[in-house]
Amino acid sequence: MNPEEQQDIVRAVVSDYFDKYADKYLPLYPKLTEKEHIINIGTSILCTKWKVGYPGGSFAKAVVDNNLSESFGRADEINVHCIRFYLMLMYNVGAPTSLVQ
C-alpha cells in the first residue's frame, strides 16, 4: 500500500471521529468553520503516531511526543483550541487492521 492510500484510510478514520465527537471535545465547535483543517491535522497526527503515510510537521510531532508546551507553541489559531480533540483522537482510536497488513 502506498503512502497516499494509507493517508486516505487514516483521513476516513479521523473524519468519522470528528463527526462523532467534535461537539464533545472542541469547546468552540458551534463556531468552527475549519473542519477540513482539523481533519487534515488529525490525519497528520495519527500518521505520525502510527508511522504510516507521510510524517507530520512540528505541531503533529509535538502532540505525538506528548510535549504540551511545544504543542501550544506550534499551534496555529485553530489548533490551539483543538489540542484536547487531538489527544482524545490519538488515545482512543487504534490503527485500522488494513494499515498493518
Q: For the regions a protein language model found, what residue spans apply to each?
A:
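Amphipathic alpha-helical interaction modules
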Residues: Y21-R74
